[in-house]
């Protein structure tokens, strides 16, 4: 089994750019940024529970990792960079730490390296369980209205919140809930030690108004790019700034 994806061909011999979206996004999320790098082949993946992969069930990160590997193999992708936002960033970090073949470098935007104690994991498990129950039972427009009131999204304007709520409400609540539980931050190991031992390039992007993830970026051995005029979702709030950072990273 493989994940649904959109494939945009580039020049042969260049490493692929493989983009992983955040929770409740889909393969379109990274395209305004990724399509600025037309010399590279690009693969925009729908993670399980999302978009064209909505019907693919997973029990945890191990299943997501195997699906990601199978998808890369199906496209004969032998050299690539992983670029992931939030949930996609966590999946990318997990894959990098497990040693996915062919990985040339890692770019993470606003991805959490992992909780560091059992109390924090228990609290997060409870919180994610409550959100999952709401995704299953309530209209998505209601749930996402509240979702975007969370502190990590304080930089969003009312208009941006409204637009994101309308966009994300096109998802399937049941499959979102299942993916949220399967890939909860509570189920993710603390990756700091493994990330700090990586031998290939590792870059971290965060919005200048995202104080939580700017602090987390200092806890991993990554080169940090701070995106001006942006909060947690930097590639949506300032796509040109993220394009500039990626161009520096990829030297394109």
Swiss-Prot record:
GO terms for biological process: menaquinone biosynthetic process. Pfam families: Abhydrolase_6. Pathway: Quinol/quinone metabolism; 1,4-dihydroxy-2-naphthoate biosynthesis; 1,4-dihydroxy-2-naphthoate from chorismate: step 3/7; Quinol/quinone metabolism; menaquinone biosynthesis. GO terms for molecular function: 2-succinyl-6-hydroxy-2,4-cyclohexadiene-1-carboxylate synthase activity. Keywords: Lyase, Menaquinone biosynthesis. It is an enzyme of class 4 (lyase). Its EC number is 4.2.99.20. It catalyses: 5-enolpyruvoyl-6-hydroxy-2-succinyl-cyclohex-3-ene-1-carboxylate = (1R,6R)-6-hydroxy-2-succinyl-cyclohexa-2,4-diene-1-carboxylate + pyruvate. This is 2-succinyl-6-hydroxy-2,4-cyclohexadiene-1-carboxylate synthase. It comes from Salmonella arizonae (strain ATCC BAA-731 / CDC346-86 / RSK2980).
